[in-house]
UniProtKB/Swiss-Prot annotation:
Cellular component annotations (GO), alphabetically ordered: cytosol
Record GO terms (molecular function): ATP binding; ATP hydrolysis activity; ATP-dependent DNA damage sensor activity; damaged DNA binding; single-stranded DNA binding
Main location: cytoplasm
Family of this protein: Belongs to the RecA family.
Keywords from the UniProt entry: ATP-binding, Cytoplasm, DNA damage, DNA recombination, DNA repair, DNA-binding, Nucleotide-binding, SOS response
Annotated protein name in UniProt: Protein RecA
Alphabetized InterPro entries for the sequence: AAA+_ATPase, DNA_recomb/repair_RecA, DNA_recomb/repair_RecA_CS, P-loop_NTPase, RecA-like_C, RecA-like_N, RecA_ATP-bd, RecA_C_sf
Any single Pfam family the record assigns to this protein: RecA_C
């Protein structure tokens, strides 16, 4: 019985060695035909963690789970009219430029306001802008930019405005059933692999439509067919909530609106998280406002009555004064922002303030050494 078991083990080992050799030969042939890295063991990948780029909003980064938009993936931002979709996308553009990247904006709606984009922090002199005439042209331009590997972020505004050439050339009233959906499906087939390979973030802004005859359930849907829904790694539902009243002489005027951003699909972190942000008219997302709220909830900023304090120092009476303090003191803003991100595991605990102190100390030590050397030379 023991002999039989030993023989069976030898046969199994021999069979296993043959299979491994066959697999190695197959991998070599695939690599020869399709290039290095066409097939690899997951453990051999240099980077297994998904790389992200901040959305430009701390609250949204937390809701996304990974700390921002995943690189090499497709993101869809949709919602009702004037809900803040383009604002959210423009903050991503500003963030990409802030990190030294190149961003492109495909303006299919022909409605981008350069002054508003600049107010949100976008460097309009460096922004690549395209306003094509048809949906096919929009997507071809986006594809060429992505294929170049030189662009970090591409925003398409919006999918609903990607009108097929056949519809543009036709007469009003002509039926063009499924043309846009077919165009989007073909675009997703072509773009997805290139987006992943070049680590480009592709943001598609979309509108809402109502399904006719729906009696039960949600009648809302997005145009462009189902392809974008399937290929998107992240889908954000942006909804404006209540209006924000001004203070002082502007107390009777609406100066912004509270906006809810729900992550309805997320392939890199748990979905269905929500972010609540303040979108101020003419300014975009209030980064100081969201930081004060989140840091206060974590007790990084202490609140006693109407006063806000940080590290034992009062920074303002009322949220508006606290916002002004953080806006006037960017170093304190960055320090608090870093602590919040460390708390949520979005960055390692290497305080930028501490790093600056170490750098200053090293510069001081170098200066002392230079002075000592100068004294020795004189002697």
């Amino acid at each position: 019985m023991a002999k039989k078991t030993k023989k069976a083990e030898e046969i199994t080992k021999k069979f296993g060695d043959e299979r491994r050799k066959a697999l190695d030969d197959a991998l070599k042939n695939i690599e020869k035909d399709f290039g290095k890295g066409a097939v690899m063991r997951l453990g051999e990948r240099a980077e297994q963690k998904v790389q992200v780029m901040s959305s430009g909003s701390l609250a949204l980064d937390i809701a996304l789970g990974a700390g921002g938009y995943p690189k090499g993936r497709i993101v869809e931002i949709y919602g009702p009219e004037s809900s803040g979709k383009t604002t959210v996308a423009l903050h991503a553009v500003a963030q990409a430029q802030k990190e030294g990247g190149i961003a492109a904006f495909i303006d299919a709606e022909h409605a981008l306001d350069p002054a508003y984009a600049a107010a949100l922090g976008v460097n309009i002199d460096e922004l690549l802008l395209s306003q094509p005439d048809s949906g096919e042209q929009d997507l071809e331009i986006a594809g060429k930019l992505i294929d170049s590997g030189a662009v970090d972020l591409v925003v398409v505004d919006s999918v609903a405005a990607l009108v097929p050439r056949a519809e543009i050339d036709g007469d009003i009233g002509d039926s063009h059933v499924g043309l846009q959906a077919r165009m989007m499906m073909q675009a997703m087939h072509k773009l997805t692999a290139s987006i992943n390979k070049t680590k480009t973030i592709a943001i598609f802004i979309n509108q809402l439509r109502e399904k006719v005859g729906v009696m039960f359930g949600n009648p809302e849907t997005t145009p462009g067919g189902r392809a974008l829904k399937f290929y998107s790694s992240v889908r954000l539902d942006v909804r404006g909530n209540t209006q924000i009243k001004g203070t002082g002489e502007h107390k009777d005027h609406n100066v912004g609106k509270e906006t809810k951003i729900k992550v309805v699909k997320n392939k890199v972190a748990p979905p269905f998280r929500e972010a609540f942000v303040e979108i101020m008219y003419g300014e975009g997302i209030s980064r100081t406002g969201e930081l004060i709220k989140i840091a206060s909830d974590l007790d990084i900023i202490q609140k006693a009555g109407a006063w806000y304090s940080y590290n034992g120092e009062k920074i303002g009476q009322g949220s508006e004064n606290a916002k002004k303090y953080l806006a006037d003191n960017p170093a304190i803003f960055d320090e608090i922002d870093h602590k919040v991100r460390v708390h949520f595991g979005m960055t390692e605990d290497d305080s930028p303030v501490q790093s600056e102190l170490v750098e200053e100390k090293n510069e001081a030590d170098d200066l002392v050494l230079d002075l000592d050397n100068a004294i020795e030379i004189e002697e």
